[in-house]
Swiss-Prot record:
Source organism, top-level taxon: Eukaryota
Protein's recorded name: Eukaryotic translation initiation factor 3 subunit G-2
Location relative to the cell: Cytoplasm
Domain RRM: 179-257
PROSITE patterns: RRM (PS50102)
Pfam families (UniProt xref): eIF3g, RRM_1
Species name: Drosophila virilis
Complexes and interactors: Component of the eukaryotic translation initiation factor 3 (eIF-3) complex. The eIF-3 complex interacts with pix.
Gene name in the database record: eIF3g2
Biological role: RNA-binding component of the eukaryotic translation initiation factor 3 (eIF-3) complex, which is involved in protein synthesis of a specialized repertoire of mRNAs and, together with other initiation factors, stimulates binding of mRNA and methionyl-tRNAi to the 40S ribosome. The eIF-3 complex specifically targets and initiates translation of a subset of mRNAs involved in cell proliferation. This subunit can bind 18S rRNA.
The keyword Protease is annotated on this UniProt entry: no
Length: 259
């Protein structure tokens, strides 16, 4: 008669009726194997076998001394090293995950309403190079100043702040062109992007105007660039005057004040 085959769980239960058997561990070369017994969520006894690779590290004297401290409390009988049941080796970090709808609500509604681009010519919500009034920007500048000057009379009654260039007598002042240069002998295919690429390496500028034909939209052959600093304008004249560009020789000079 053959002996009945029993599982390891039945053998453990027969030897340890009142509880789980103690954990066992043994070292095999550079590896340590630990066998533990515990109950799972269904109340059944299970065996957990874990393998650890042993590594030797050089630590400071303070760390080595701290590892030899006598344990106390629930960890009084624990072996050297942290116990996952009583010790946390890292700080607990709580994270809140946001969905796509929560992210949309978290955005500032004021920022969402701001335009991505603003035209320097007509203040529209587009780039200056795509402005439909680009060919008549010089005329629009004088009209915009006249309209703003007329609006000052109404804003003065409400006590609002009036910029210095719009106060009484300011419209008679001459425009500051001390840092403006005139670039001529440009090709018909010249664009604002080409002009910006030509001058941006010299220094920062505050305004740029490329003269174009109304009907064809081609370049008239000249442009104006207002640099932020006069020394950069002088450097632009020195570098670009007589410089070859698009099979033409550029002519760069100081911009003459308008009469």
């Amino acid at each position: 008669m053959k002996a009945a085959i029993t599982s390891w769980a039945d053998e453990v239960e027969a030897d340890y009726v009142d509880g789980l058997p103690p954990s066992k561990e043994y070292v095999d070369g550079d590896y340590k194997h630990v066998t533990e017994y515990k109950f799972n969520d269904e109340g059944k006894k299970i065996k957990v076998v874990r393998s650890f690779k042993i590594e030797k590290k050089i630590v400071s004297r303070a760390v080595a001394k701290r590892r030899n401290w006598v344990k106390f409390g629930d960890s009084k009988l624990d072996k050297p090293g942290p116990n996952s049941y009583t010790t946390k080796v890292a700080d607990e970090i709580l994270m809140n995950y946001m969905g796509s709808k929560d992210f949309e609500h978290a955005q500032d509604p004021l920022d969402a309403g701001k335009p991505m681009a603003k035209c320097r010519i007509c203040n529209g919500e587009h780039w200056s190079v795509k402005c439909p009034y680009k060919g008549t920007s010089m005329d629009m500048e004088s009209k915009a100043i006249a309209a703003a000057t007329a609006a000052v009379g109404e804003t003065n009654k409400t006590g609002k702040y009036v910029p210095p260039f719009l106060k009484d007598g300011a419209k008679g002042r001459e425009r500051d062109d001390s840092s403006a240069v005139r670039i001529s002998n440009l090709s018909e295919s010249m664009t604002e992007d080409d002009l910006e690429e030509l001058v941006k390496k010299i220094g920062p500028y505050t305004k740029m105007y490329l003269a174009r034909e109304k009907n064809s939209g081609l370049c008239k052959g000249f442009a104006y660039v207002h640099f932020k600093y006069r020394k950069d304008a002088a450097e632009a004249i020195e570098i670009l005057n007589g410089h070859g560009y698009d099979h033409l020789i550029l002519s760069v000079e100081w911009s003459k004040p308008q009469n």
